[in-house]
Amino acid sequence: MVRRWLKLLGLIAALVVLAAACTSGDDGETAGEGEDAPLPEASAPVAAGGTEAGGEDGAAASGGTLEAVQSRGTLICGVNDAVPGFGFTDEDGNFAGFDIDFCRVIAAAVLGDPEAVDFQPLTAEQRFTALQSGEVDVLVRNTTFTSSRDGTEGGQFTTTTFYDGQGMMVRADSEFESLEDMQDTAICVLSGTTTELNLATRFGAGDIAYEPVPFEDNETLQQAFEQERCDGWTSDKSQLAGVRSAFPDGPDALRILDETFSKEPLGPAVRQGDPQWFDAVNWAVIATIQAEEYGITSENLADFDNTDDPEIARWLGQESEEDGTVFDPGLGLEPDFNRTVVEQVGNYEEIYERNIAPLGLERDANALYTDGGQLYPPPYR
C-alpha cells in the first residue's frame, strides 16, 4: 500500500516538473534566451542625432555610443557658449575654450579628427536632460561631479579636468571685503546649479540674510549684474575670473573675494550604463595628463618616435622591441590614439596655457602631482 502511494506521489511530482518546463519554454520563445520579455508599452529611447534606438545612431542612447559616434563620424558635445576661458564663441563665431578643447581631445581619440565635433550649447538646466535623452554624446560644460548627478541625474563623470571652488565677485568700489559683509544683499546666481545650493548653505550657516536672484544663463545674469540689480555674483572662481577678464568696464571694475566656499571638481560626463564609451572618454582625457608627465608636447612629439623608453613606446602605440606587437588595452580606439590627441590638440599644460592662463589663474590643484597638484594619470598597460 505504501509503495502504491509513493509511486502516485512520484507521478504527481513528475507532472509538476514537466508542466514547469513547458511554461519556461514558452517564455523563452517570447523573450529570447535568458532575457525578460519586453514591456509592450515601452518606446525606443531617442539617440544622439534624434533617431530611435536601433536606427543608425540608436546605440547612442541604448548603450553603444562609441560605435554610434564612429559610425556617424561626428561627436556631439554639450557645451557652454558664454564662459570666457572655458566655453564661448570668439569674434569669428567659433567655439573656443578649455572645455571646447576637451571635446576636441575626445574627437581626436575616437575619430582621429579634433574638428569632427558638433558643439551643442546648453543651459545649466538643460544639460542633464540632453545627456540622458541622447541629444548629446558627452557633456563637457563646466559641470561639477556630485553624488546626485552621478545617481539621480544618471551621469557618469570621467577624470576631473579642472579642480575649482565657488567664490563671490563684487564691484571693485563696493564696501564688501568678505561674505559676512554681505548682509541683506541681492546675489545673482545661475539656477539649477550646485552654485545655487552652495550659496544657500554658506549664507545660511553664516546667518547672512540675502535675496537670491536666479537666472537660467550667464548672458541674462551678466546684464542684471551690469544694471546693478545684484550686489554680488557667485559662481565657480574660474568662471568669475573669465567673466572679469572680459567685463565691459574692464577687469579692474570687479573684485573676487578671497573666500572659497565649496569644492567643484569639473569634468566630462557621459550617460550611465555604457562602460565602453566611459572608458574611451576617460582615457582620452587621461592622455593629455600623461603626455604632460612624460614631457611630450605637440611640438616635440616627433622626438619620441624612436624612444628607448618601453613605457612611452607602449603609450604612443609603437611596436614592442621584444616581440614586435603593439599594445591594445581594449578600449575600442586606435592603438596610437594617445599620439593623435597630443599631435592634434596638445597635452594638458598646452590646453591650460592656451585657455586658462590668460585669465590669471595659477595651476594650483590643477598641476601634476609631481608639482603639488592633483593630476595623477593611472598606468597605461
Where are these regions (language model features)?
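Extracytoplasmic small-molecule ligand-binding "clamshell" domains
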Residues: 50, 57-139, 333, 368, ...
